[in-house]
Each structure stands twice: as structure tokens, then as C-alpha cells.
Amino acid sequence: MRRQVTESKRKLGRVDAVALHWPLLLDAPASEDDARSVRADAWRELEAMVDEGLVGCLGLSNFDVELMDEIIALARHPPVLNEVEMSPRCYQAELLAACEARGVRVVGYSPYGTC
């Protein structure tokens, strides 16, 4: 991650936000504890980038309430956004309310052609 963020900052001059995308692993971990550990390690690396001034703030992408709370519980720099599918056909009211209650802004997306 660091190499990509550093390269983006070099090209753009600044990186306002980076989102930890997709909380599940493509290669199945040995256990849920392993998956939790991978997410925590990734978040800590992102927080180090904030500390170093590489990134302005952090967010999540496709995290449900349980997994969002997992990150919030360990975060020194809590997520400011959660990018999730949100459309008239996929209105996630519970997730939206949970994000609002935690001060996390929802960035909605809709796969092309689903509306």
C-alpha cells in the first residue's frame, strides 16, 4: 500500500483520503482471527501514513456495521467514510444509520446499469 500511496502523492501533490477496500480476503485465511489480524495490520499501516503526512484521512469501502466497528475499536485515526453500494434498489438503511451514529460519512456507489 505504501508504495502506491507514495507514488500517488508524488503525481498528485497530495492524497486527501485512502480507503481500506473490501474487508474480506480473496485467499481464505486459516481463521476469522487471521482475517481480523490482516485487517488490523492494514489499518495500522494506513494510520502510520497519516502520522507521516502521506495521507490526510482514512476511510473504509464495503464494510458492514460489525466490521466497521472492529476497525473503529482499534483506530487511533478513525475512518471518516465508508464507500458502499447505495441506490434505490440497494438502500442500506441500517448501515447508513450506523455510519451516521459513528460520525462516518457514507459515500454511495451503484454498479453501472443497476438503477
Residue ranges and their predicted role:
Residues 1-20, 48-52:
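CE4/NodB-like, metal-dependent polysaccharide N-deacetylase domain
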